[in-house]
Amino acid sequence: MALRAMRGIVNGAAPELPVPTSGPLAGSREQALAVSRNYLSQPRLTYKTVSGVNGPLVILDHVKFPRYAEIVHLTLPDGTKRSGQVLEVSGSKAVVQVFEGTSGIDAKKTSCEFTGDILRTPVSEDMLGRVFNGSGKPIDRGPVVLAEDFLDIMGQPINPQCRIYPEEMIQTGISAIDGMNSIARGQKIPIFSAAGLPHNEIAAQICRQAGLVKKSKDVVDYSEENFAIVFAAMGVNMETARFFKSDFEENGSMDNVCLFLNLANDPTIERIITPRLALTTAEFLAYQCEKHVLVILTDMSSYAEALREVSAAREEVPGRRGFPGYMYTDLATIYERAGRVEGRNGSITQIPILTMPNDDITHPIPDLTGYITEGQIYVDRQLHNRQIYPPINVLPSLSRLMKSAIGEGMTRKDHADVSNQLYACYAIGKDVQAMKAVVGEEALTSDDLLYLEFLQKFERNFIAQGPYENRTVYETLDIGWQLLRIFPKEMLKRIPQSTLSEFYPRDSAKH
């Protein structure tokens, strides 16, 4: 019997085994069939044909039928295992991008095993409350996640016809956002910041306070059912990672947070898959577990620089500032994985954070990001230098979906008009401030002085607030009206007469 089974294996057929119907050997035939069939028809081929190492790339020769995006396992001479992905195929040559970096790879002694599969990540609802590295491996000393499914990290394409237009406003508790750049559930809106500005504190405050608008002032309910946060850090320092982790733990939301951390001392190339792992997890939580997921991606500038490094190693023709010409497309594959889908209650709201090099908003990274996303929140260095927190400059900030998320039935009927009037007065106030620097205060008219007074009070009372101050959208609008009462009714030209007669005469508090 054993000889016949062995002969079957040699001839390429499954071994014929007796089929026990009960006892510990039940199912042994199925197991033998599965094991033998897998490796006889599709063997995993191992190669020791590394012909060169260039930056994060490994070039292999004499590879049989390599496939684009196939996952490769590399075993180094000391037994260390690394994984990579086929980036380019040319005949029997394959270019493999190694996620953990190529340091220590010996061209003669490194063996490469082609798996025949694409990069999939294990996903489960148990990932909430856990901390992973940039490759998706647990680093919180907890057990390996028991996967409910293995999903392609590039995500599933969503039929545009099945997308739902975002219409539910998320109340962040920050007046500069809620009052003038309202965020809808399912929107993608980045924070444009720069080195040394408190963008992490703003993102943490949004995470703490985000929830749906409560229809009544009387009900104070900050709980949010089915709410989850997926946080992905790329190239951040340990201080930033620790800040977010401790903030989530202190406000008791760590059980609803999944963290992916690629630190500054981790391989650069790993940053290319970190946001995709995070978004794949978010899609599982949103569309299969039907949770409302907020995805924070920081820092997208580190991601773009990793992309430039791979492009340079492949000797591709560079675009603006050395970034690859396909960076727009590549960023879109990340940002477009936000939104809502018909037939599913879950949603994905994305808030990517990017630091503008040299505070330059025309740099390719913020420039291309602004084309793809639905607005931006602009963090301003001048406001920060004047000790205003959050230093959000509302003039270059924008939310393209604000119009559909506010108004009667969603926030309040005067919301859009108040926002427009505040924008207009603040813009004129900025012009008056610039004119005052040239001609002096004595040359200003009485109207100009009103705009100057509004400018100062707007920045001190409306924009400025505490890091733990959670204002409702109604409180934000009331503060806006207090500021607008600085002007006589006739100067408020952006607000209809009916709205003015209802809200303007209200007894004003101190402002």
Swiss-Prot record:
GO annotation terms (biological process): ATP metabolic process; pH reduction; proton transmembrane transport; vacuolar acidification
Pfam families: ATP-synt_ab, ATP-synt_ab_N, ATP-synt_VA_C
HAMAP family, per database record: ATP_synth_B_arch (MF_00310)
PROSITE patterns found in the cross-reference section: ATPASE_ALPHA_BETA (PS00152)
Membrane association type: Peripheral membrane protein
Binding site for ATP: R400
Organism annotation: Bos taurus
Family annotation (SUPFAM superfamilies): P-loop containing nucleoside triphosphate hydrolases
Record keywords: ATP-binding, Cell membrane, Cytoplasm, Cytoplasmic vesicle, Hydrogen ion transport, Ion transport, Membrane, Nucleotide-binding, Synapse, Transport
Function in brief: Non-catalytic subunit of the V1 complex of vacuolar(H+)-ATPase (V-ATPase), a multisubunit enzyme composed of a peripheral complex (V1) that hydrolyzes ATP and a membrane integral complex (V0) that translocates protons. V-ATPase is responsible for acidifying and maintaining the pH of intracellular compartments and in some cell types, is targeted to the plasma membrane, where it is responsible for acidifying the extracellular environment.
GO-annotated molecular function: ATP binding; proton-transporting ATPase activity, rotational mechanism
Name of the featured protein: V-type proton ATPase subunit B, brain isoform
Species classification: Eukaryota, Metazoa, Chordata, Craniata, Vertebrata
